[in-house]
């Protein structure tokens, strides 16, 4: 019996089709690492961000005060210490009210709180389905970038304009 001989000019086809499917896949493999700094310019950790049905934010933080803290995406890609007011208001392309529990809708930059342990560390994953990496007005890059801001207290999820979350204690610029 003779072995089956493949025409070598077509030997690449079994590999080409799966690669073309991957190239057309809408899932982005790009990731951005945002370093967060406190009012003294000291790093307090990072946020690994990637797109997956919104933006996934994986927090790995240290040297923060114990307790529940708010984290928001703010309008400007600027983090001037000590108060980080340069980051501007919450990212809000639809001009909605503040708070995930607000019946009138919420800012695109509003997100769930996270908890810092007694050791000053926090690891958390937050998903924000109201923002993206695209080119529309919900893109976190639409204004030349945005900022990730950690607040001293928890967000109450309803009080306009910022949820009574207290001072801005850490900030990181989000840019491509």
Model-found features: residue ranges?
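Bacterial N-terminal signal peptides
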Residues: 14-23
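Bacterial N-terminal signal peptides that target proteins for export
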Residues: 5-15
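N-terminal leader/targeting pre-sequences
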Residues: 24-176
């Amino acid at each position: 019996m003779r072995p089956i001989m493949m025409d070598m000019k077509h030997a690449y086809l079994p590999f080409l089709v799966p690669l073309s499917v991957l190239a057309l896949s809408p899932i982005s493999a790009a990731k951005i690492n945002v370093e967060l700094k406190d009012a003294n310019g000291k790093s307090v950790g990072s946020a690994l961000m990637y797109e997956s049905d919104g933006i996934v934010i994986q927090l790995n933080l240290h040297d923060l005060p114990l307790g529940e803290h708010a984290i928001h995406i703010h309008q400007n890609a600027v983090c001037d210490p000590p108060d980080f007011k340069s980051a501007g208001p919450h990212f809000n392309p639809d001009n909605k009210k503040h708070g995930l529990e607000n019946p009138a809708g919420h800012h695109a930059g509003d997100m769930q709180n996270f908890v810092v342990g007694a050791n000053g560390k926090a690891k958390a994953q937050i998903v924000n389905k109201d923002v993206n990496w695209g080119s529309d007005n919900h893109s976190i890059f639409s204004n030349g970038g945005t900022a990730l801001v950690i607040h001293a207290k928890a967000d109450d999820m309803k009080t306009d304009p910022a949820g009574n979350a207290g001072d801005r204690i850490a900030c990181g610029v989000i840019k491509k």
